[in-house]
């Protein structure tokens, strides 16, 4: 019998078997490596060892992910059992005490307060579980996002292409904006949930004739209805372009990419921030158009056909 009030931590059978499977595979791999080492020359053993280490590292990464799953589900099981026990105790206490009489307008506020007090720990538990799950998924997404970023940097003008071909952004971009964007090598979007929901947009540039900044950061506070400007990196225009930047900013008072880029508090700029955070960052490839390679025996023209 387990002590009263203690919790049983059950590891789900699916995860336990998967974790054991990883352990058996790693053990078999090491044993096989040892046997092969007696049959080959030292050079072959050294080459094989590198492969074994690589396989063991891969198995180790899988084991870590499985362990994350196990710990997450163990915590959920423990929390669920604790919640069940608390509910049972509350039910026993309610059965021992005579039930309340008919609800009246005078007694309703007290009853609502009692219910709210019971609800608070449940809400706190839900927030913790959601936060752990979000952090876990962010860890899993990161290597894929890093790999995607490395591939994108090998494609010249990728982000200029993507932004210019977005159905809403295309109407807000001029030819000069497009040229400025051609120097952009990377885009990163990050989100923070605590203490406030914050969306951070980082635009990375190589050397260009417009400004000195290598990174432009724009931050927005996010709520249910809107993105609200919070902070932006001041743009360090080159002296040769500063007058033109001032002219462009004051010549056109309508919403466009340049006004968003140069003036963080420009009216309506939250629309562009929302497009970048919620659409372009999540799947830029859907807006990228590739140049169609010229067919053999044909001359390449300036207006090469685009492929979706």
Swiss-Prot record:
<dbReference type="InterPro" id="IPR002164">
    <property type="entry name" value="NAP_family"/>
</dbReference>
<dbReference type="GO" id="GO:0005737">
    <property type="term" value="C:cytoplasm"/>
</dbReference>
<keyword id="KW-0539">Nucleus</keyword>
<dbReference type="InterPro" id="IPR037231">
    <property type="entry name" value="NAP-like_sf"/>
</dbReference>
<dbReference type="GO" id="GO:0007283">
    <property type="term" value="P:spermatogenesis"/>
</dbReference>
<keyword id="KW-0334">Gonadal differentiation</keyword>
<keyword id="KW-0963">Cytoplasm</keyword>
<keyword id="KW-0217">Developmental protein</keyword>
<comment type="similarity">
    <text>Belongs to the nucleosome assembly protein (NAP) family.</text>
</comment>
<dbReference type="GO" id="GO:0007548">
    <property type="term" value="P:sex differentiation"/>
</dbReference>
<dbReference type="GO" id="GO:0042393">
    <property type="term" value="F:histone binding"/>
</dbReference>
<comment type="function">
    <text>May be involved in sperm differentiation and proliferation.</text>
</comment>
<dbReference type="GO" id="GO:0030154">
    <property type="term" value="P:cell differentiation"/>
</dbReference>
<dbReference type="GO" id="GO:0003682">
    <property type="term" value="F:chromatin binding"/>
</dbReference>
<keyword id="KW-0597">Phosphoprotein</keyword>
<dbReference type="GO" id="GO:0000785">
    <property type="term" value="C:chromatin"/>
</dbReference>
<dbReference type="GO" id="GO:0005634">
    <property type="term" value="C:nucleus"/>
</dbReference>
<dbReference type="GO" id="GO:0006334">
    <property type="term" value="P:nucleosome assembly"/>
</dbReference>
<protein>
    <recommendedName>
        <fullName>Testis-specific Y-encoded protein 1</fullName>
    </recommendedName>
</protein>
<dbReference type="GO" id="GO:0007506">
    <property type="term" value="P:gonadal mesoderm development"/>
</dbReference>
<keyword id="KW-0221">Differentiation</keyword>
<keyword id="KW-0744">Spermatogenesis</keyword>
<dbReference type="Pfam" id="PF00956">
    <property type="entry name" value="NAP"/>
</dbReference>
């Amino acid at each position: 019998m387990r002590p009263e009030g203690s919790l049983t931590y059950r590891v789900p059978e699916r995860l336990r078997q998967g974790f054991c499977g990883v352990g058996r595979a790693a053990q078999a791999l090491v044993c096989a490596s040892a046997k092969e080492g007696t049959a080959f020359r030292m050079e072959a053993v050294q080459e094989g060892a590198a492969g074994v280490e690589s396989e063991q590292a891969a198995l180790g990464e899988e084991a870590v992910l499985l362990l994350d799953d196990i710990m997450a589900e163990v915590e959920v099981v423990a929390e669920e059992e604790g919640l069940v026990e608390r509910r049972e105790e509350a039910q026993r206490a309610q059965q021992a005490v005579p039930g309340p009489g008919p609800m009246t307008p005078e007694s309703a506020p007290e009853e609502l307060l009692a219910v709210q007090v019971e609800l608070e720990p449940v809400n706190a538990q839900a927030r913790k579980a959601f936060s752990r799950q979000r952090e876990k998924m962010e860890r899993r997404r990161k290597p894929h996002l890093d790999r995607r970023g490395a591939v994108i940097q090998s494609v010249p003008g990728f982000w200029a292409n993507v932004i210019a071909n977005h159905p809403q952004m295309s109407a807000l971009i001029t030819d000069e904006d497009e040229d400025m964007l051609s120097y952009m090598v990377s885009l990163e979007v990050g989100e923070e949930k605590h203490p406030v929901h914050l969306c951070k947009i980082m635009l990375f540039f190589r050397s260009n004739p417009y400004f000195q900044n290598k990174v432009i950061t724009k931050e927005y506070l996010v709520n249910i209805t809107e993105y609200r400007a919070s902070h932006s990196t001041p743009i360090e225009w080159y002296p040769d372009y500063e007058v033109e930047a001032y002219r462009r900013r004051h010549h056109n008072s309508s919403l466009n990419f340049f006004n968003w880029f140069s003036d963080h508090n420009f009216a309506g700029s939250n629309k562009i921030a929302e497009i970048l955070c919620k659409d372009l960052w999540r799947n830029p490839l859907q807006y990228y158009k590739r140049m169609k390679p010229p067919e053999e025996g044909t001359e390449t023209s300036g207006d090469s056909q685009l492929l979706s």
